[in-house]
């Protein structure tokens, strides 16, 4: 985690926005701070942003600490999401394999080009992926414990993923764990009803 912080955080503000997508995301957060409208923010002063608001909320919250929206503050949520995902992934692998394997997996994750690019960009992808990956790890742990109770933290994170880029943030983790359970011999209907309930709970913030 320390290596990832040293590789990513110091360089977030070193380059200006280099694609059309980055300023398009940042301008929505800027409009939130200027207008005070955090529910229906606008893009370029007139168009209502068509993506769910969680990523924009993140940029606006970080930028409010700095006093303005900058390249650093706009990219920081993506970097923070990556670091959280990497820590969770390390803990997940270390518990089921060993620390050496977890460390190697973390280095491979950090050195993956597309993952690194998403971690230093002002785009929704890294935040959504982090929520999905962490949710998958939590759902896997829930499955290991016999699917007892409701995995509330996974539900919360899937809800955040849904608020970041739509229903795929809940559907994908539930579908992955559902397929895994079927391959492990669990009956279709038991897997279906338990995961549908979890998925519906995670949709509550989206409504």
Predicted feature locations:
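Membrane-integral, polyisoprenol-dependent glycosyltransferases
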Residues: 1-207
